Amino acid sequence: MASEGYNPNRTRVSDNTQSQWLRSNVTGTVTEVPGIGEATARTLENCEDRITTTYQLMGKFLSFKGANVGPIEHADRFFYWLRRIGTVAGQRSSVVRAIAEKLQLQFPDIYDPDAYDVENSTEEDGENKSMWYNMQNLGKW
């Protein structure tokens, strides 16, 4: 499932942007989430869940976490939901990564960036390894 679904190596968000997002307070404006522009914001607002805030989007992500749902399946469920509602294809992995890593700060083990194959990513993808991993392991907190 992970090869077709969510993959953090497909994010288009720079490490700097992701780092700023992880360090910032959530304001509630859905476009504050890296990877969400006006088109995705409209899609979220017009979906059956009427997502208009960052808090609602985080709640949607958390709603896919069941008792026997591991981190990879959880991220995939959110990714496939984003696809089903018609969000911009090239930004889905960015949105999943942004929300998952932000929530990982409060809910340890909800996201596991080490579960993805970063060795087989392209050089460009290599720049966007998990910001959570980099900050945690490089002492940038």
Task: Describe these PLM feature segments.
Residues 1-141:
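C-terminal extensions
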